[in-house]
């Protein structure tokens, strides 16, 4: 896996360094044979994208970053998704990085739409589902999520074709690292 254009000459920590109290820098490694195209980011509550997500070619890693809104005591949360071009699905990542750790924790979720589902719903639909909804959901989007406060154990979503493994730090300038890859013995998608 080699760095793509968004990480050329910088690091994930470098993407997160915006001078804001709450930021989230996200790196995705694509171990599949499918390009991850048409990134769609939805940042909640007037948060800002400081580096835009980009397509992720097979064998590459790319990064982007978001921050809390200016002049507010809020965190940053949202979703980003990419189409697995050729697999006719979307890979979806949800994050929540709060302003106050006295009452809230960092959360991250990863998942995939069912085959044939590539459309992105409007607004916060995926965020609300992945943050508040049951993880045994049998709808168009299937996912796992985890809390990153006392532990930073990975969150793993797996189906018959793909496995997504993600970690998130438990600090205000959060770093998220995610790998999407074929499941074991699924060499056709490698």
UniProtKB/Swiss-Prot annotation:
A motif (Cell attachment site, crucial for protein stability) lies at residues 138-140. GO terms for molecular function: toxin activity. Expressed by the venom duct. Phosphocholine binds at residues 78, 96, 98, 131-132. Keywords: Cytolysis, Ion transport, Membrane, Nematocyst, Secreted, Target cell membrane, Target membrane, Toxin, Transmembrane, Transport. It comes from the Eukaryota. One of its GO terms (biological process) is killing of cells of another organism. Signal peptide: none annotated. Residues 2-21 are annotated as: N-terminal region. It is found in: Secreted; Nematocyst; Target cell membrane. Its main location: secreted. InterPro entries: Actinoporin_PFT, Cytolysin/lectin. The keyword Iron-sulfur does not apply. Belongs to the actinoporin family. Conoidea subfamily. Pore-forming protein that forms pores of around 1 nm and causes cardiac stimulation and cytolysis. Octamer or nonamer in membranes. Monomer in the soluble state. This is Tereporin-Ca1. The lineage of its organism: Eukaryota, Metazoa, Spiralia, Lophotrochozoa, Mollusca.
């Amino acid at each position: 896996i080699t760095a793509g254009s968004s990480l050329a000459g910088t690091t994930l920590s470098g993407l997160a360094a915006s001078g804001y109290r709450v930021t989230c820098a996200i790196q995705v490694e694509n171990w599949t044979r499918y390009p991850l195209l048409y990134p769609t980011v939805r940042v909640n509550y007037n948060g800002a994208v400081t580096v835009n997500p980009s397509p992720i070619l097979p064998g590459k890693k790319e990064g982007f970053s978001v921050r809390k809104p200016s002049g507010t005591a809020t965190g940053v949360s949202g979703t980003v998704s990419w189409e697995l071009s050729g697999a006719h699905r979307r890979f979806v990542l949800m994050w929540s990085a709060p302003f106050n750790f006295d009452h809230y924790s960092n959360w991250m979720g990863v998942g995939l739409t069912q085959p044939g589902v590539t459309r992105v719903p409007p607004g916060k639909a995926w965020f609300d589902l992945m943050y508040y909804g049951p993880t045994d959901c049998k709808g168009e989007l299937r996912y796992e999520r985890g809390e990153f406060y006392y532990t930073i154990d990975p969150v793993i979503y797996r189906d018959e074709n793909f496995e997504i493994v993600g970690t998130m730090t438990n600090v205000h300038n959060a770093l998220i690292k995610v790998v999407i890859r074929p499941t074991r013995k699924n060499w056709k998608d490698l």
